[in-house]
Amino acid sequence: MSLVPEASTSRAPKYCYFFKTLLVEELELETSYHNLHYGQCALIGRLAFKANQYRLENVRVKCLPKKYSLGEGTVSLLILGLTHDKVVENRVSTGRYCIVRGEVVLHNVQHPKGAKLTAGGVYDKINSLSNDPLAQKQYLSALLATYRPAIDLWYIQVIDRAEDLLTRRLEMRSLIEK
């Protein structure tokens, strides 16, 4: 698979103005950042605190066959903007299942206070380099080396029966996308 999208077939991503239900895996395992979800989303997972950062771990998706489903907690996504004070204020705690709403961003892991990027910004940059496929490839390689998907937190809430809720939301999503 090529890192460089075909300029003639690639379409600009449209910002998602509703909290589309996504899997933690869909964001964390995406390596083509120009294909990353652009905009708002809702994620269901288990809150974890690792390496001095709050993260949302994936939840096993019951409706998928085992060979297509990762075990719970296999991957996790950084939650930007979640502080100890917000954890206390929202009555959430590590190990609990949560729904997180926010915006998908790319976070610079080498310079955490650096600028955040979005799939729209990545697309625009790739398009600006459309006459230079080598520059496109170098740009995307540099992104993969320094940026990781994250969620810029807007809201977090503890939930019960996370697997069931996630399954139902994914079923609804598949009906809407048909």
Curated annotation (Swiss-Prot):
The entry's function note states: Part of the MTV complex that associates with the HipHop-HOAP complex to form the terminin telomere-capping complex involved in telomere maintenance and prevention of telomere fusion. Potentially functions downstream of mei-41/ATR. As part of the MTV complex binds single stranded DNA in a sequence-independent manner, protecting it from degradation.
- What happens when the protein's gene is inactivated? Lethal between early pupal and early adult stages. Frequent telomeric fusions in larval neruoblasts.
Relate the assembly described in the record.
Probably homodimerizes. Component of the MTV complex, composed of moi/modigliani, tea and ver/verrocchio. Interacts with ver/verrochio and tea (via C-terminus); the interactions are direct and require fully intact moi/modigliani and ver/verrocchio. The MTV complex is recruited to telomeres by the HipHop-HOAP complex, consisting of HipHop, cav/HOAP and Su(var)205/HP1 to form the terminin telomere-capping complex. Interacts with cav/HOAP and Su(var)205/HP1; the interactions are direct. Probably interacts with peo (via N-terminus and UBC domain).
Q: Protein name, please?
A: Protein modigliani
One GO cellular component from the entry? chromosome, telomeric region
Q: Which GO terms describe its biological process?
A: protection from non-homologous end joining at telomere; telomere capping
Q: Which organism is it from?
A: Drosophila melanogaster (Fruit fly)
Key words, A-Z: Chromosome, Nucleus, Telomere
Q: Which domain of life is it from?
A: Eukaryota
Main localisation: nucleus
Fill in the misc note: Multiple telomeric fusions result in multicentric linear chromosomes that resemble little trains of chromosomes, hence the name 'modigliani', the name of an Italian train named after the artist.
Q: Any S-S bridges, and between which cysteines?
A: none
Cell compartment(s), UniProt? Nucleus; Chromosome; Chromosome, Telomere
